[in-house]
Swiss-Prot record:
InterPro entries the UniProt entry points to: OMP_Chaperone_SurA, PPIase_dom_sf, PPIase_PpiC, PPIase_SurA, SurA_N, Trigger_fact/SurA_dom_sf
Keyword Chaperone assigned: yes
Gene name per UniProt: surA
Flavoprotein keyword on record: no
Keyword terms of this UniProt record: Chaperone, Isomerase, Periplasm, Repeat, Rotamase, Signal
Gene3D superfamilies tied to this protein: 3.10.50.40, Porin chaperone SurA, peptide-binding domain
Name of the protein this chain belongs to: Chaperone SurA
EC number(s) per entry: 5.2.1.8
Superkingdom classification of source: Bacteria
Catalyzed chemical reaction(s): [protein]-peptidylproline (omega=180) = [protein]-peptidylproline (omega=0)
PROSITE patterns: PPIC_PPIASE_2 (PS50198)
Alphabetical GO biological process terms: Gram-negative-bacterium-type cell outer membrane assembly; protein folding; protein stabilization
Amino acid sequence: MIQFSSDRQLKFRKYWLIYAVFATMLAADVFAQSSYSREDIKPIDRIVAVVNEEVITQQEINEVLQNTVQQLQRQNTQLPRMEILEKQLLERLILKRIQLQRAKEIGLTVSDNDLDQTLRRIIQDNHLTMDEFRQVLLQEGTDMNRFREEIRGEILMSRLKEQEVNSRVNVTENEIDNFLQNQANSPAGNEEYRIAHILVQISEQMDEAQIEARHKRAETAYESLRQGADFVRVSAEFSDAPDAMQGGELGWRPLGQLGSPFTEMLVNMQPGEVTPVVRSPVGFHILKLLERRQQEQKVTIIEQTHAQHILIKVSELVSEEDAHQLINQLMERIHNGADFMDVAKAHSEDASASAGGDLGWVSPGDTVPEFEQAMNALLPGQVSPPVRTPFGWHLIKVIERRSQDVSERQQREAARHTIHARKADAIVQEWLQQLRDQAYVEYKVEDN
C-alpha cells in the first residue's frame, strides 16, 4: 500500500542515530592532547590521488586524519604510525569517492527534503535543539552546510549498496524454515555474539604472489595481537574493512549470521579471545569475541487495527488546495450517509481502491507516523477528518481492533533478516573490490 513505510527507512533511522552519537562524541580539544600535534599533519594542500576524473587533496586527508586521531585517542588506543594511518585513510577516501561516482552514474540522488528529514531525526534522537546542534558542529570545526553534504554522501552510499547488493539478495521461506530448525537443534542457537574483525582483502585480479603477500599481512596482524597489541590499533593499521577505524566493531550478531567456519570457532571461544587467520573468498579475516549473551525469547502481543482509507494525491495536475477541497467534499458525502467503501472505490488513488480502501490488519509501524497517529485516535466505526501525509490527503476509517500474538511472525522476520545480512555480508566486500578494480586511480607521490 502506498502509505506504508519501508524497512529501508527504518534501517536508515537506526543508522543515522549511530552516526550522530559518534559525531557528537568527538571533542575538538582531544587532538591537541594527542601525541601527534597539528604540525605533524602536512599543512600544504596538494593533489594526492586522482580517482577517475576527480582528485583527492591533502586537505581532505588532513581533516579525516584529525577526526580519526581524536576517535582513537578517546578509546585510549595506541596510535599507528602517521604514515600508515594516512595511507589507510587515503584508501577509504578513494573507495568513498568511487561509490559516490557510481551513485551519480546510475542516477541516484538525495532530495533536500529527504536530507532535512534525516537531519531532524539526528537532532531529535540526540535530544538537541537546532541551535545546540549547530554549536556541536562548530566545536567540531565544521558547519551545518558541510555536515549536510557529508550526510548526503552517506545516504547515497547506503542507497547504492541497497540497489546493487541488498536488492539482489533473496531469502526463501524454505531457508527460513531450515534456519529456525537448525537454531532449535543447536545448543548455541539462541546466543548472540558481539564481535570485532580485521579484514585483509583480496580480489580475483590478484596472482598467487599478491595473495600470499596479503596472507602474510594478515598473519603479521595476528602475531601483533598474540603479542598483546590492542585490537583497535591493529585494525586501524591493517584492516581493509570500512569499519577499521572504529576498531572493526560489528556489534551484536546472532550465530546464524556469521556463517561457517566462524560459527564453529566462536562457540568454543571466551570473550577477549581472537581467531587465527581465516580465509574467505574476499580475503583473510581475524575475529575477536568481545561478549556473548543469550537472546531472550519473548511473547509479543500487539494491537492491530483493521482500517480503510481514501487517498487523494497532490501532483503537478492536482494542487494542494484542490486535493484538500476534494477530500473535504468526500468527507461530507460520507457524513451525509454515503458508504465509505463505495466512495473509496470511486475516488481513492491508492492501490487499495479496488478493495474499497481496505488495508486489512495494520500493525504498529506499518504506516507513516501521520497516518498511524490519526488512525490510533479513532474508535471503531469512526472516520477521521482529512489527514495530510507525504503521500497526499487521506480519510481513515477504523473497522475494528484486536490483540495479536506476533511472536512467531517476528521470529521468522528476525530469521529472514539474519539470513539476508549473512548473504549480503558475503558479497558486499567483493562488490566494493570490483568497484575499486574498475576505477582509474593514480597516486601522486610527493617529490623529495
